[in-house]
Design a protein with these regions (language model features):
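Residue-level signal for inorganic ion chemistry
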Residues: 19, 111, 185
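Short, charged, surface-exposed secondary-structure boundary motifs
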Residues: 24-28, 148, 202-203
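Hydrophobic packing residues within well-ordered alpha-helices of enzyme cores
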Residues: 3-6, 124, 128, 199-202
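Acidic, Mg2+-coordinating phosphoryl-transfer loop and its flanking beta/alpha structural elements
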Residues: 158, 168-203
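Short, well-ordered alpha-helix to beta-strand connector turns
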Residues: 12, 108-109, 132, 188, ...
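Short, acidic/turn-prone active-site loops that include or flank metal/cofactor-
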Residues: 20-22, 37, 142, 196-200
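Active-site phosphate-binding/coordination module
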Residues: 1-79
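Conserved acidic, metal-coordinating active-site core of Asp-based
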Residues: 48, 52, 59-175, 179
């Protein structure tokens, strides 16, 4: 669920969640469009990455689930100190996250692979891009490989809302600070990279 401090801001009527996998109308919490990962792709992702020293997160209808060991010590898995409180307050604990993902492989908005360093991250991305066809891969922070259905993405979500409201891209402004914002910023008539963004990638 989105923080009340966000959804209570006047003028914010829609929400794009899970890297564009779902679009909601805030007033009545109606889901206007959603994608889920295919069962086959979830199975492939878990099989291809089982020998990597990683853990996982899964998202179902906007709720995040993660492994007990990750929630207890996010820094051990590459998270920064200032991210600890966020991870621990937003993730629902699962003793066996792999079994959980397998049990819910037909209803995942998206899933994250939590890696320990950039080299491992690039290897995981390389393997997934080569072997799994129907997924969209992006990243918002260094330790995450974020995966959703191939037609998801923030650009896709913003495009849907733009057309739903009868607007055109020139009338859209978007703000972003990470790799998973790039396609959205390119789509918007006014794309703005935040001062703390990875400017080399977003410029």
């Amino acid at each position: 669920p989105l923080p009340q401090a966000v959804v209570s801001i006047p003028g914010i009527e829609y929400a794009i969640t899970s890297n564009g996998a779902a679009v909601y109308r805030i007033q009545d919490k109606q889901c206007l469009r959603s994608y889920v990962l295919t069962e086959q792709s979830v199975k492939k992702i878990l099989e291809l990455t089982k020998d990597f020293p990683v853990t996982y997160e899964g998202f179902i209808r906007g709720t995040a689930y993660a492994a007990k060991e990750y929630i207890e010590d996010p820094v051990k898995f590459g998270a920064t100190e200032h991210a600890v409180a966020y991870v621990q307050s937003t993730r629902h604990l699962q003793d066996d996250i792999v079994s959980f993902l397998k049990q819910h492989d037909d209803e995942l908005d998206s899933m994250d692979i939590v890696v320990k360093d950039e080299a491992q991250k690039q290897k995981v991305i390389e393997v997934l891009k080569a072997e799994v066809e129907d997924i969209y891969i992006t990243s918002s922070i260094s330790q995450l490989v974020e995966i959703s259905y191939k037609d998801a993405g923030k650009r896709s979500g913003v495009k849907f809302i733009t057309e739903y409201l009868g607007l055109n891209p020139k009338q859209v402004a978007a703000f972003g600070d990470a790799d998973n914002d790039i396609d959205m910023l390119e789509y918007a008539g006014c794309g703005i990279a935040m001062e703390n963004a990875s400017i080399g990638r977003l410029a």
